[in-house]
Amino acid sequence: MASQGTKRSYEQMETGGERQNTTEIRASVGRMIGGIGRFYIQMCTELKLSDYEGRLIQNSITIERMVLSAFDERRNKYLEEHPSAGKDPKKTGGPIYRRIDGKWIRELILYDKEEIRRIWRQANNGEDATAGLTHMMIWHSNLNDATYQRTRALVRTGMDPRMCSLMQGSTLPRRSGAAGAAVKGVGTMVMELIRMIKRGINDRNFWRGENGRRTRIAYERMCNILKGKFQTAAQRAMMDQVRESRNPGNAEIEDLIFLARSALILRGSVAHKSCLPACVYGLAVASGHDFEREGYSLVGIDPFRLLQNSQVFSLIRPNENPAHKSQLVWMACHSAAFEDLRVSSFIRGKKVVPRGQLSTRGVQIASNENMETMDSSTLELRSRYWAIRTRSGGNTNQQRASAGQISVQPTFSVQRNLPFERATVMAAFTGNTEGRTSDMRTEIIRIMESARPEDVSFQGRGVFELSDEKATSPIVPSFDMSNEGSYFFGDNAEEYDN
């Protein structure tokens, strides 16, 4: 991408830093990770969790959610102004699972948000450490991406369920900053914009007055984020049209849906980061690892290394398959929900199966589920190889637009050939090329029709042995190309509902 010169790297976004060199970036990301780890250890002490209980992923998620809730300024303010029955705006909590007499017991805990904020700041050298909070949000988002399908949300905004591979980060909160914006898929941004436009259509005052001015600024900012994800001039020009519209309405919604469809072939650039549960960082810090001194990267070997020697447990329901639960969490850890299953399987060294074939529900346990029958097992989060995370859409030719992989948003920078029936996607583009954006639409369709799926994406990029930390000798896998491995096809997973 030619225009990337002014952009900050992810790690800079992640840590709010200005331009830094690699060492400084690794140190500041390390500082962020170390802070999460120290916070987790302190929380385990406060809650008197045993070593085993501290490694339970469900406990980790509760602790992460508590600190995210404690720092959610807007919601805290809202809760104080609209007191609801039985909700103390100053407290936060959740289920903590303890092992008592060979059984798992659920205990609901409640803490002062002020106290949680104090513990978090103390673990982060007295700072608010927003980067660490965003990091945990992205981990939760990646877990949701691997666990739930967003068919209903897609249909509600007038999009097509086949666009599910564009929905990365669709459950990230608005407050997730630049690092959050980087990991949002094209479909997620389109959906946020459509919701906004629909509100404007239904509510005459949405764009008016002082509030309306702020709304407008947010709208244009979101348009620019989405524009930055597209890699062809025609798609970007169309985004300019949407952004500059005086009074956004149905024409803009049409344009956005058109752009989302086009992203199935002309993939947008979406960042991928390996964000791990807080307990993993806690374990490493507790065993004496100094993240800031050693440095850390979210897109290199470091997360793989960490998972190689961390033991994390999970509660398992009576009819769930522990191996499937492990796959779900592994995919979440590497932000691989939208990656080609063949690539994931090769890196993991175990077959990664489509979601419809998993015998496992989500990781979190609902408050009405029976604990009597709960068991726990070790999550197998190790991998055979490691690979660099990408933020390109995997289009084969950056100079002139070409095809990325349909139904897949690549996570790993690993060579793969592109099995791909362009006809099936092109069928979605019959019909409307009228209106203000007709020339751009025609141009985008022309690019897609001429986009040859060249032989391979990420040519020459391979995976690395876990001993090869400097990534010196890539192993380029060869895949059986009879079918494209999308995780979502033939799917019957449950929906994500807030």
Swiss-Prot record:
Encapsidates the negative strand viral RNA, protecting it from nucleases. The encapsidated genomic RNA is termed the ribonucleoprotein (RNP) and serves as template for transcription and replication. The RNP needs to be localized in the host nucleus to start an infectious cycle, but is too large to diffuse through the nuclear pore complex. NP comprises at least 2 nuclear localization signals that are responsible for the active RNP import into the nucleus through cellular importin alpha/beta pathway. Keywords: Capsid protein, Helical capsid protein, Host nucleus, Host-virus interaction, Ribonucleoprotein, RNA-binding, Viral nucleoprotein, Viral penetration into host nucleus, Virion, Virus entry into host cell. Homomultimerizes to form the nucleocapsid. May bind host exportin-1/XPO1. Binds to viral genomic RNA. Protein-RNA contacts are mediated by a combination of electrostatic interactions between positively charged residues and the phosphate backbone and planar interactions between aromatic side chains and bases. Belongs to the influenza viruses nucleoprotein family. A motif (Bipartite nuclear localization signal) lies at residues 198-216. This is Nucleoprotein. InterPro entries: Flu_NP. GO terms for biological process: symbiont entry into host cell; viral penetration into host nucleus. GO terms for cellular component: helical viral capsid; host cell; host cell nucleus; ribonucleoprotein complex; viral nucleocapsid. Residues 1-23 are annotated as: Disordered. A motif (Unconventional nuclear localization signal) lies at residues 1-18.
